Amino acid sequence: MGLLFNNLIMNFDAPSPWGIYFQDSATPQMEGLVELHDNIMYYLVVILFGVGWILLSIIRNYISTKSPISHKYLNHGTLIELIWTITPAVILILIAFPSFKLLYLMDEVSDPSMSVLAEGHQWYWSYQYPDFLDSNDEFIEFDSYIVPESDLEEGALRMLEVDNRVILPELTHVRFIITAGDVIHSFAVPSLGVKCDAYPGRLNQVSVFINREGVFYGQCSEICGILHSSMPIVIESVSLEKFLTWLEEQ
């Protein structure tokens, strides 16, 4: 139960029943996405109440007036036409510029400290650390399969646990190089603000900077076959000392 408490109560880094909001952010790009969502939601709420007030006012005036068609000879109103043309344009600009800025910032991959190659297969992920060698002087690499429900430990998350986690150091610029070996997959970890399609024969890349320790869960987000739901992703962020110890054990 300790694992479940740490993952779901202290930090919401995994899907939870009846969840209605984002998982807790662990990277600057995810914090930016949450802030953008909240700002856009503010505009949407204002629009909702504004349009609702106008609609209710029209209905009330229509019901209370003696002549239901008292404005049948009104052809146009220049002022109101300007208002309903300019106001949406201004709102769209206020939404567009922050989203464009965030989009370009998320697309930048500058001077990463290390790289991880993630390759999607039917139906598992394989990972490679091209910057580090194991005891056989080969790149550190491994496959990551879902843990069957019959093998889950108490407190583990169903359909989300894997046999081999991706271990990364916190406070480090990491570049994920993402591809696929058969069909199209998608590498998605909500707490990290990462969602990148994996195409056979093509390399995509995303940058992450994990600002705290934790275990972050994701899944393949592109329908890729009958066991599409059996491709979880688990990334564990640890201190630099623990990461170096893990490297020595490989």
Curated annotation (Swiss-Prot):
Pfam families listed in its UniProt record: COX2, COX2_TM
Location, primary (coarse class): mitochondrion
Coiled coil: none
Chain residues that bind Cu cation A1: H185, C220, C224, M231
Cofactor(s) recorded in Swiss-Prot or TrEMBL: Cu cation
Binding locations of Cu cation A2: C220, E222, C224, H228
Binding site for Mg(2+): E222
Endpoints of the signal sequence: none
Topological domain ranges for the Mitochondrial matrix compartment: 62-77
Subcellular localization: Mitochondrion inner membrane
Entry GO terms, CC: mitochondrial inner membrane; respiratory chain complex IV
Stretches that traverse the bilayer: 28-61, 78-107
Sequence ranges on the Mitochondrial intermembrane membrane side: 1-27, 108-250
UniProt KW keywords: Copper, Electron transport, Magnesium, Membrane, Metal-binding, Mitochondrion, Mitochondrion inner membrane, Respiratory chain, Translocase, Transmembrane, Transmembrane helix, Transport
Known catalytic reactions: 4 Fe(II)-[cytochrome c] + O2 + 8 H(+)(in) = 4 Fe(III)-[cytochrome c] + 2 H2O + 4 H(+)(out)
Cofactor note: Binds a dinuclear copper A center per subunit.
Example of a GO biological process term: ATP synthesis coupled electron transport
InterPro entries (UniProt xref): CcO_II, CcO_II-like_C, CcO_II_C, Copper_CuA, Cupredoxin, Cyt_c_oxidase_su2, Cyt_c_oxidase_su2_TM_dom, Cyt_c_oxidase_su2_TM_sf
GO MF terms held by the record: copper ion binding; cytochrome-c oxidase activity
Subunit structure comment from the entry: Component of the cytochrome c oxidase (complex IV, CIV), a multisubunit enzyme composed of 11 subunits. The complex is composed of a catalytic core of 3 subunits Cox1, Cox2 and Cox3, encoded in the mitochondrial DNA, and 8 supernumerary subunits Cox4, Cox5a/Cox5, Cox6, Cox7, Cox8, Cox7a/Cox9, Cox6b/Cox12 and Cox6a/Cox13, which are encoded in the nuclear genome.
Family: Belongs to the cytochrome c oxidase subunit 2 family.
Protein name, per record: Cytochrome c oxidase subunit 2
Organism encoding this protein: Neurospora crassa (strain ATCC 24698 / 74-OR23-1A / CBS 708.71 / DSM 1257 / FGSC 987)
Gene from which the chain derives: cox-2
